[in-house]
Amino acid sequence: MKILRKTHPLLKIVNHSFIDLPTPSNISSWWNFGSLLGMCLVIQILTGLFLAMHYTSDTATAFSSVAHICRDVNYGWLIRYLHANGASMFFICLFIHVGRGIYYGSYVLSETWNIGIILLLTTMATAFVGYVLPWGQMSFWGATVITNLLSAIPYIGNTLVEWIWGGFSVDKATLTRFFAFHFILPFIITALVLVHLLFLHETGSNNPSGLNSDSDKIPFHPYYTIKDLLGIFLLLMTLMILALFFPDILGDPDNFTPANPLNTPAHIKPEWYFLFAYAILRSIPNKLGGVLALVLSILILATFPLLNTSKQHGLIFRPITQTIYWIFIANLLVLTWIGGQPVEYPFTTIGQIASITYFTIIVIIMPVSNTIENNIIKL
């Protein structure tokens, strides 16, 4: 008798990707975050779909439609808070996933890595346009400030900003198009995820030792499906605790006030997961320089395969670069903290030092430590 999953054209693809996939036998829990990101994407698309059924993308009714979802729709409050906090869980998993990729040298699989960077940028764009939709004070002013940064682009800047706004300020046209973008982008992300997996399965997974694992592989199912289910259970539990006990802990109090173009909040800041990039943007006094630094703070990830001079794969046997890596992570946490602080001394100075450190570690210090370690091996 033929096994259906091995012969059916559609099931065969699923089988080769998730069931009989040869997987290194030693991959740790840090490799769980790929499946957790998939789970987050499914949660966001499903909760988002139900929210879109009740939301109205009009400046006059957007804020009250979100209030209506929370008050009058069956379990609307839960769907809304799962969606809002699901975004935070999504970004926590994303940052850990990227961090694991840097630590274990997964960037040598350059196609997978580059698609991952595109995925990160697309997810950030989706979260940004989504944050505008409730049409609270921080939604409105966040949209105004961030889109206005494009005006720093020479020659076409002002035209580009007005084109994105659909007028001379953030208004009804902006909200409507942002809703359209927020609806379509998750499906683009899903397509990119499939490409990401396609490239990953071309080369096979990396593993903690950084050594070739072709001689020691096991099927993905049941070993890693069970392991992933544990991760998914823990993720769902954390998300439910957040959504049920602390639903607004990661939000901004200003967003409980309807958008008012005549009243600027004291401190305009984005969601917590953008604060590191926002701190880098604010640390440069020049507008265009700040925008370039903001974009480069993410695009610099693409330089990892190019700047990698190490003869070893990953950081597991490289104590010098390991120490630098953890300094880099600590520096990112400092940037995140600074992004949420007011623009005044000493925060501006700390932000500038942390921003310089961020770029210096990636471009100069890590390649130098790689070379030092290569020379130590020769001794």
Swiss-Prot record:
Q: Where in the cell is it found?
A: Mitochondrion inner membrane
- What Pfam families does this protein's entry cite? Cytochrom_B_C (PF00032), Cytochrome_B (PF00033)
User: What's the domain of life for this entry?
Assistant: Eukaryota
Q: Where this protein primarily resides, as one coarse class?
A: mitochondrion
Question: What keywords would UniProt list here?
Answer: Electron transport, Heme, Iron, Membrane, Metal-binding, Mitochondrion, Mitochondrion inner membrane, Respiratory chain, Transmembrane, Transmembrane helix, Transport, Ubiquinone
Q: Which GO terms describe its molecular function?
A: metal ion binding; ubiquinol-cytochrome-c reductase activity
Q: Which residues bind a ubiquinone?
A: H201
Mark the transmembrane ranges.
Answer: 33-53, 77-98, 113-133, 178-198, 226-246, 288-308, 320-340, 347-367
| Binding positions for heme b b566 per the UniProt entry | H97, H196
Biological processes, Gene Ontology terms: mitochondrial electron transport, ubiquinol to cytochrome c
Q: Which residues does the annotation say bind heme b b562?
A: H83, H182
The record, for PROSITE patterns, names: CYTB_CTER, CYTB_NTER
Q: Which InterPro entries match?
A: Cyt_b/b6_C, Cyt_b/b6_C_sf, Cyt_b/b6_N, Cytb/b6-like_sf, Cytochrome_b, Cytochrome_b_C_euk/bac, Cytochrome_b_N_euk/bac, Di-haem_cyt_TM
**Needed co-factor(s):** heme b
Cellular component GO terms held in the UniProt record: mitochondrial inner membrane; respiratory chain complex III
How does the record classify its membrane topology? Multi-pass membrane protein
**Cofactor binding note from Swiss-Prot or TrEMBL:** Binds 2 heme b groups non-covalently.
Q: How does it assemble?
A: The cytochrome bc1 complex contains 11 subunits: 3 respiratory subunits (MT-CYB, CYC1 and UQCRFS1), 2 core proteins (UQCRC1 and UQCRC2) and 6 low-molecular weight proteins (UQCRH/QCR6, UQCRB/QCR7, UQCRQ/QCR8, UQCR10/QCR9, UQCR11/QCR10 and a cleavage product of UQCRFS1). This cytochrome bc1 complex then forms a dimer.
Q: Which miscellaneous remark does the UniProt record hold?
A: Heme 1 (or BL or b562) is low-potential and absorbs at about 562 nm, and heme 2 (or BH or b566) is high-potential and absorbs at about 566 nm.
Q: What does this protein do?
A: Component of the ubiquinol-cytochrome c reductase complex (complex III or cytochrome b-c1 complex) that is part of the mitochondrial respiratory chain. The b-c1 complex mediates electron transfer from ubiquinol to cytochrome c. Contributes to the generation of a proton gradient across the mitochondrial membrane that is then used for ATP synthesis.
Family classification: Belongs to the cytochrome b family.
State the protein's name. Answer: Cytochrome b
Q: Which organism is it from?
A: Deltamys kempi
Whichever gene encodes this chain, its name is MT-CYB
